[in-house]
């Protein structure tokens, strides 16, 4: 499975909204086996959203700011009310087709202006 993630970088002012798109070359398992991961500078990636839209437990930032949506081959992560703390954070999608067929998107870096 091949995951195409866009954009590779997004520059937004504080308080704005970021939309990240992820497209699978073929439908993921059960149409919803798509995860989003969040990687802050100097840290390993952490699970943010599972099953396309289910927020992971223990998300430290305001969980209401993160929303996952989509099904089949098209998925979206929306981050609202971007904060300074979001700067240089990279988000990755991961599609799951089977136990030995899963892949990450190329990542999207959030650049915060101001």
From Swiss-Prot:
InterPro entries: Ig-like_dom (IPR007110), Ig-like_dom_sf (IPR036179), Ig-like_fold (IPR013783), Ig_sub (IPR003599), Ig_V-set (IPR013106), IgV_Light_Chain (IPR050150)
Annotated GO CC locations: immunoglobulin complex
Region of interest: Framework-2: 36-50
Region (Complementarity-determining-3) residue spans: 94-103
Stretches for region Framework-3: 58-93
The entry's keywords: Adaptive immunity, Immunity, Immunoglobulin
Transmembrane segments: none
Native source organism of the sequence: Oryctolagus cuniculus
One of the GO BP terms on file: adaptive immune response
Residue ranges of the region described as Complementarity-determining-2: 51-57
Protein name: Ig kappa chain V region AH80-5
SMART domains attached to this UniProt entry: IG, IGv
Region (Framework-1): 1-22
Superkingdom, taxonomy of origin: Eukaryota
Gene3D superfamilies in alphabetical order: Immunoglobulins (2.60.40.10)
Additional remark text: This chain was obtained from antibody to type III pneumococci and was isolated from the serum of a single rabbit.
Framework-4 as annotated region, ranges: 104-113
Keyword check for Transport: no
Region (Complementarity-determining-1): 23-35
């Amino acid at each position: 499975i091949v995951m195409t993630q866009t954009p590779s970088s997004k520059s937004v002012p504080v308080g704005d909204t970021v939309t990240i798109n992820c497209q699978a070359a073929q439908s993921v398992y059960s149409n919803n086996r798509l995860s989003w991961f969040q990687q802050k500078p100097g840290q390993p990636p952490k699970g943010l959203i599972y099953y396309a839209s289910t927020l992971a437990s223990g998300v430290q930032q305001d969980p209401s700011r993160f929303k996952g949506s989509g099904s089949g081959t098209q998925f979206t992560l929306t981050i609202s009310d971007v904060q300074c703390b979001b700067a240089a954070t990279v988000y990755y999608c991961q599609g799951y087709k089977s136990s030995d067929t899963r892949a990450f998107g190329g990542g999207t870096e959030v650049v915060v202006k101001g």
